[in-house]
């Protein structure tokens, strides 16, 4: 595919607001997961999450507009404003917006339905209903920055942000829009935390690929990227290829068992970028500290690569579903920008059949091409290749 430039980035993440603060979090190797203090977890098995703290939305959004936005929309608009500033100026009006979210505004939906039941349809606040839909954050981004191209929202669980990136990249490559804001948003609500705990999805520590892993840490946040056509456009990284597949053995609540299908999506992304396996300098993995998903991914990696390149697992820092998967993507972009692979937080010992050890320390390395994997419950697999150069 035609390479697409990433010309600006912005982030509201657990433990870090702003790109350089996020880069510092990754470089320190510290997890942002802490005991939950936003709601009571008494009676649950899990008690930790990666929450956004010290975020002041009024620094990014005018007070009158702020009142109309839920937490997800605030994450999205703030991240987009930072990305536009990082770019160095406003986008053309014809630009598009593509946002990803794993679950959308769950808490807003709960708040609206509670008032609907208690007060009736006539008295339930209409502004809450408007914010209860998954595309509210993307709509606010389009309105805030007067962007009149496409405006879509992808709800693909773990793969939401990478799928949104693929859509926007294709539209720019075809000349439909000159540029786009691409991002992801999600937040940790009491009801979502409780449901995931009840089905046994959550653990107390995020330990991707580690043999002692027993569940994911729930994360939240927002991230945004500016995409523009790569010809003569300098960027901090470039989008160069995508691959997709679906595992028919997966159910809505698991990731499936066919490592060959996951490997086929990785292979397709590499070929779409015009590259070979030996061109991939590292893999930014989808591993989320669940037994089944991590095993599926490492088996797929080992089946595709005879010599496995360095593998980085970032969700030990900020949990799963954080910004609809966009934080993992942003970490890979920063690796290319800074020419440094991050350590894999939470890993100490792998399973016996693993032929590789995820990165244990930050590694300064000549990085030209990174593979980013995203495997979602329900069987969807999206893989992308990011490159350092425009050609």
Language model features with spans:
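A glycine- and small-aliphatic-rich helix-loop capping segment at beta-alpha/alpha-beta transitions
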Residues: 20-25, 107-122, 173, 194-205, ...
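Active-site-proximal alpha-helical scaffold in enzymes
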Residues: 76-88, 134-137, 142-145, 151-183, ...
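Glycine-/small-residue-rich "gating" segment that lines the acyl/pantetheine channel
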Residues: 118-125, 166, 170, 187-234, ...
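Active-site pocket-shaping loop/turn-to-helix segments
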Residues: 13-16, 63-81, 124-133, 151-163, ...
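Condensing-enzyme catalytic core mediating Claisen C-C bond formation in acyl metabolism
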Residues: 2-12, 19, 24-35, 204-275, ...
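Conserved beta-ketoacyl condensing-enzyme motif
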Residues: 5-6, 21-23, 27-156, 277-295, ...
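Acyl-CoA/ACP chain-elongation machinery
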Residues: 176-200, 204-209, 213, 242-256, ...
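Flexible, low-complexity linker/loop segments at domain and module junctions
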Residues: 1-6, 91-94, 235, 277-279, ...
């Amino acid at each position: 595919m035609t390479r697409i430039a990433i010309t600006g980035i912005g982030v509201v993440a657990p433990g870090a607001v702003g790109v350089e603060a996020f880069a510092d979090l990754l470089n320190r190797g510290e997890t942002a997961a802490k005991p939950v203090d936003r709601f009571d977890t008494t009676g649950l098995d899990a008690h930790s999450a990666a929450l956004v703290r010290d975020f002041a939305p009024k620094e990014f959004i005018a007070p009158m507009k702020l009142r109309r936005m839920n937490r997800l929309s605030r994450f999205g608009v703030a991240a987009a404003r930072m990305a536009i500033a990082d770019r160095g100026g406003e986008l053309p009006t014809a630009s598009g917006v593509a946002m990803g979210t794993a679950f959308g505004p769950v808490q807003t939906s709960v708040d609206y339905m509670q008032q609907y039941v208690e007060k009736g349809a006539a008295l339930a606040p209409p502004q809450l209903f408007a914010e209860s839909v998954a595309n509210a954050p993307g709509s606010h981004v389009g309105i805030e920055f007067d962007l009149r191209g496409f405006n879509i929202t992808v709800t693909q669980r773990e793969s939401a942000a990478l799928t949104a990136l693929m859509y926007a990249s294709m539209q720019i490559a075809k000349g439909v829009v000159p540029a786009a804001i691409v991002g992801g948003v999600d937040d940790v609500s009491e009801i979502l935390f409780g449901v995931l705990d009840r089905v046994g999805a959550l653990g107390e520590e995020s330990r991707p690929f580690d043999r002692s892993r027993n569940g994911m840490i729930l994360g939240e946040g927002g991230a945004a990227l500016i995409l523009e056509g790569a010809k003569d456009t300098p960027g901090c990284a470039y989008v160069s290829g995508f691959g997709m597949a679906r595992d028919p053995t997966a159910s809505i609540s698991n990731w499936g068992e066919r490592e060959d299908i996951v490997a086929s999506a990785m292979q397709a992304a590499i070929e779409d970028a015009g590259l070979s396996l030996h061109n991939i300098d590292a893999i930014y993995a989808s591993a989320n500290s669940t037994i089944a998903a991590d095993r599926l991914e490492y088996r797929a990696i080992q089946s595709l690569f005879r010599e496995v390149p360095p593998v980085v697992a970032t969700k030990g820092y900020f949990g799963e579903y954080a910004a609809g998967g966009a934080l993992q993507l942003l970490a890979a972009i920063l690796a290319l920008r800074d020419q440094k692979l991050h350590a894999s937080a939470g890993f100490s010992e792998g399973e016996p059949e693993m032929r590789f050890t995820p990165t244990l320390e930050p590694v300064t390395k000549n990085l030209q091409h990174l593979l980013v994997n995203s495997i979602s419950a329900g069987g969807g697999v999206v893989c992308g290749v990011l490159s350092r150069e425009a050609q």
